[in-house]
Amino acid sequence: MSAVDVESRVRHQNFWFVACFAVLVIQIAVEYMMGRVPICACGYVKLWEGGVNTSGNSQHLSDWYTPSHIIHGFLFYGLAHLILRRKPLAAKLLLALVIESGWELLENSPLIIDRYRTATIALDYYGDSILNSAMDTVFMCVGFFFARRAPVALTVAIATFFEIFTGYIIRDNLTLNVVMLIWPVEAIKVWQGGV
């Protein structure tokens, strides 16, 4: 490979990574314009928020829903690998970031916030802080890069563990969240309310 080819390849890869960073910046800017709070209204930032039905949930760096975003990364890597097989890794990451950022914007819209509050146990959910939402996207990237390196069986095992563990501890996880958002089941809502 000639020096010109290497330089062209590096420039091409850099373009994709700049585009990835731009998606995250746009997500943050749009959430700010939507009126989302930058950090928790409590005025401080915690590494971990362990409460589920608390005012700090979805406001700090990580919480019980962080494993769901890591699983998003696993899933989005798989999708990108299938449909962008010949594209560079950064192009695959860009697809994952566009999907995750799109979800974060939708999740923090009045439509979805109201849906969560009426169909799930998240009665006091008012949306994520910008910091939490951005970290959700970063954790998706962690899952994406993990899935790229790890054997598929290990990735599936970790996703299964995350789902079972969070389901057991907080009676919620990615699967239950999707079910309750799309097709609420009263029995699940009652069970989740027992936390």
From Swiss-Prot:
It holds the Pfam family DUF2585. Belongs to the UPF0314 family. Its main location: membrane. Signal peptide: none annotated. The keyword Cell cycle does not apply. It is a multi-pass membrane protein. This is UPF0314 protein RL4541. One of its GO terms (cellular component) is plasma membrane. The chain crosses the membrane at residues 15-35, 64-84, 127-147, 150-170. It is found in: Cell membrane. It comes from Rhizobium johnstonii (strain DSM 114642 / LMG 32736 / 3841). The keyword Electron transport does not apply. Keywords: Cell membrane, Membrane, Transmembrane, Transmembrane helix.
